[in-house]
Amino acid sequence: MADTLAGKTLFITGASRGIGLSIALRAARDGANVAIAAKTAEPNPKLPGTIFSAAEEIERAGGKALPLAVDVRDEAQVRAALETTAATFGGLDIVVNNASAISLTTSQATDMKRFDLMHGVNARGTFMVSKFAVPYLEKSANAHILMLSPPLDLQEKWFAPNTAYAMAKYGMSLVVLGLAGELRRKRIAVNALWPRTTIATAAIRNLLGGDAVMRASRTPDILADAAHMIFLKDAGSFTGNFLIDDTFLSENGVADFDRYRVDPTVDLAPDFFVPDDSKPPASLKKLSG
């Protein structure tokens, strides 16, 4: 397989900031085309980045960018965005379902509007983007769909503190399980990628404790590097995998994980939904908790 994404076209949801933008920038450094499918067209004082600022960064990194204002809950917007992407760049090779809504609340503290948002974005949005991307991906020589979602480790401890969010996030992983089997004969790979530790994004800062958790996190670059490696795999054989970022990178020759740490002096904070039997690479320093 090729060792570059040069000339490939990616459609990434939630790519105006954070993990989605990091994946986009890693592809852009290869010379890829990137459609930025996100809601943020106007600046938000609480969340940095818009589809237009992301497009500027992608272009500076060496890629070609297409900013698209898209709500992944809206069928017409999703269909139109995929059609525009394929028409602009002459096809579609990779879809990244990164957009996600989160509310770390108990059942009694979760209002139904928030419940519907999480399921509409996470499970339904992921299914819909993937579904409508298939006719374009079928024409690619090495098509990939990637979900930023956890391994299917259905334990009470993951659900009890925030049932609605866990349901919605695992819903994305169920899409992986189903579509990997359905699309295997079409040679469209469908995989999931999940971080072992918290990742330094605005969402983590706002939801999990501000600067202290940020210092105990890794940068989004670890997921960007892992995603890049996934996209270079043969789609006909590398599918149906639920991957933890550092384990996958270690298995593919990466040994230095300190470069991803925000603060190397602080113990790393573990993320949600990492299975108990998922062992970190031997070179990984201590996690807290």
Protein language model features and the residues they cover:
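Substrate-binding pocket helix/loop in short-chain dehydrogenase/reductase
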Residues: 106-107, 111-116
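Catalytic loop of short-chain dehydrogenase/reductase
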Residues: 138-139, 143-185, 194-199, 209
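Short-chain dehydrogenase/reductase
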Residues: 2-89, 102-103, 113, 260-261, ...
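C-terminal helical subdomain
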Residues: 192-193, 211-289
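Conserved Rossmann-fold SDR core element
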Residues: 27, 91-93, 173-176, 183-195, ...
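Active-site loop of short-chain dehydrogenase/reductase
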Residues: 8, 63-64, 91-92, 137-151, ...
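A short, exposed helix-loop element centered on a Lys and neighboring polar residues
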Residues: 130-131, 177
